[in-house]
Amino acid sequence: MVSPDDSPEIRDRPRPRRCLLPASVTVEPVIFLSMFALALQGPLATQYLWDRLSADIGFNGTRTVGCAMNGSKSAGPEQQEVETLTAHWSLYINLGGFLVGLFSVMLLGPWSDKVGRRPVLMLPCIGLALQAAVYLLVMYQELHVGYFLIGRFISGISGDFNMILAGCFAYIADVSDRQSRTFRVAVLEACLGIAGMVASIIGGHWRKAQGYINPFWLVFAVNLFTALYVYFCVEESVKDKKPARLFTHRHYQSFFRLFTVQGENNRRRKLFLYSLALLVVVTVHMGAKNLFVLYELSYPLCWDSDLIGYGSAAEHLTYLSSLAGLRLFQLCLADSWVAEMGFISNISGLVVISLASTTPIMFTGYGLRFFAMATTPVIRSKLSKMVEEGEQGALFSSVACVEGLSFLLATGLFNSLYPATLHFMKGFPFLLGALLLLIPAGIIGLIEVCEQKPMYSQFSEIS
């Protein structure tokens, strides 16, 4: 039975905007607010783990104790134990969210191709709000940090932040044409950077002034507000909605069909190669990002909350500078070569950071990475252009799974490697990340060169 509102005449009528925003503004506030909450929560959660685990083992250290040991080459054994415990608990907590979220995203993405994008944008916002509520409960009751896993489990069931990313990028793919898609995707990623920069600056000062509780209340409120924004202000982008069951194996089939059905122009091979490139890029990005705070907290940098906030702001500023650079270089270069320039920027910055022993050198490394985030919009856009309109949700859910797997690899590899290499080179994980980035740089360059060869052969035949 079809309700009156679902009749073709009513469904095709233009619907008025439900909020006072320009028509060109769609899901940008969703990704901005969600990233703001995540960027505010992330460094504070790491610092809370440090403080709680320090108290549990009786380390009254403050991190400046290890920094003031007569210029000693390394921190004391207690501080190294705290670093190791913090890195390991970060691994356990992130692992819990990934394992649950992997199956949720594989269901929700293809489901959104049928029922629309709005439900899969609201659900993870609510899940992230509940996660913040669990974190608040742990802090109020001073429970063991292992209870953070409950919050990550709840967030994972609802799709987590990766589902918000997938939903927003699929939405932009729905409403943009092929020519403007790369830049529209880059705008979304710039929203990630601006939100992260603002949250990082606020978070450091706020924690220093009032502790952890009040910032996490803001995280809770922002996630709830984002869900309300989606409900009242985001118009549906899927043109032909139809009812569909959520829990069915067909969604998994749609997911895997992308990589098993051979399309035109070696589509399957290119999807696999671009996904592999994205896997490595995001693994290095997440792995380095997870360690930045821990690297800055400990000897020899020994940053306080203010400097950590400025460092995180500098890291997120790369999203904005990469957007400007992408727009500029697109005027004279193909997207693939713009991505190659992003790799050069990222690799050089990570090498400098791996050797940083003073604050100016650390910020120099951040500065060299000014164009580092130009690679991911190019890869997302190329992936989106390879599939049909009705496959965007399945595609970006696969991208979300790749990013979730990247997060798992990043936390497993980098968080385990960091304590294992403390005794000979603290910055070794960043150096390893720079080397790993040579793999996607080679993949993207090779595909671009191979795609140009037929064009040259056609010219030679004509001549």
Swiss-Prot record:
InterPro entries: MFS, MFS_trans_sf. The chain crosses the membrane at residues 28-46, 87-112, 117-139, 145-158, 182-207, 213-231, 271-293, 307-329, 336-355, 360-380, 393-418, 427-445. GO terms for cellular component: apical plasma membrane; basolateral plasma membrane; endosome; endosome membrane; plasma membrane. GO terms for molecular function: folic acid binding; methotrexate transmembrane transporter activity; symporter activity; transmembrane transporter activity. H(+) binds at residues 160, 189, 285. It catalyses: folate(in) + H(+)(in) = folate(out) + H(+)(out); (6S)-5-methyl-5,6,7,8-tetrahydrofolate(in) + H(+)(in) = (6S)-5-methyl-5,6,7,8-tetrahydrofolate(out) + H(+)(out); methotrexate(in) + H(+)(in) = methotrexate(out) + H(+)(out); pemetrexed(in) + H(+)(in) = pemetrexed(out) + H(+)(out). Disulfide bonds join 67-302. It comes from the Eukaryota. Its main location: membrane. Residues 1-27, 113-116, 159-181, 232-270, 330-335, 381-392, 446-463 are cytoplasmic. Monomer. This is Proton-coupled folate transporter. The gene is slc46a1.
